Structures are given as structure tokens and as C-alpha cells.
Amino acid sequence: MNLLIDTHVLLWWLDDHPTLSQKAKDAIADGKKLVFISAVVIWEIRIKQKLGKLEIPNNFRKVLDSQPFEQLDITVEHAHAVGDLPTHHCDPFDRMLVAQTKVEHLTLVTRDIRLKKYKIPIIEA
């Protein structure tokens, strides 16, 4: 199954951070699966950067573009799916990732175990 990676997973992957689990690293590097980055992940990163909660390098876009990731835009169908989710979790970025995981039949790579309540496929990061 193809993958959708959460914000912290993307940042850990790009930084080769030891916090990222070997299982997650292997799944992302597999080469047999498509790995998607949602527009909501970039949106969250840029908001946190603007608020001073996150530092990203000046060449972040170039570094990201050099990765073999597919872009996943936010669609009207995704937005409707967010509205259909139970309120197990209130973070709007995570809720969109859950909706996209469901609609697009993906596996979410995340460290956030609260998202398991949505009964979606997850690889723990």
C-alpha cells in the first residue's frame, strides 16, 4: 500500500533524525510504494515557521523537491471526509491527513498513536 507521511515524519526523514523508527525508514525507502506528501503538511510547516515554532533551512523547497515524493493536493472530497470523521482528535492538520488516508486508500506514517482511533492503516514512526 502507498504511504502518506505526517509532518514530523517528513522533517525527521529530511534531517535523517534518529527518532524516526527503522520500520518507517524502511517503508519510505522501499522504492516499491509511492510516498505522498500532502499539501497540508507543507501548510503546517510554513505556519509553524512563520510563528517561530519551527526553523527550516532556506533551501527547504529545493531539498523537498529533491526527494522522490508525490504531491497530494487537498480536494473537495478530502474536505467533506474531514467533516465525516468522529472527533477523536482536534488538530485540523492531522484530521485532514486521516481523511486523505481514508479517501486515497493510503497508509499513514506517523508517531501520533491517537490517530489509531480512526481505524486507518498506520506505520508507527
Language model segments and positions:
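Short, well-structured N-terminal submotif of metal-dependent ribonuclease cores
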Residues: 1-37, 50-62, 104, 113-117
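Acidic catalytic patch
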Residues: 61-88
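Acidic, PIN/NYN-like endoribonuclease modules and their adjacent C-terminal/linker elements
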Residues: 98-125
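Alpha-helix capping/helix-boundary segments
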Residues: 9, 41-42, 78, 97, ...
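Generic structural signal for small/hydrophobic residues in well-ordered secondary structure
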Residues: 7-8, 45, 75, 82, ...
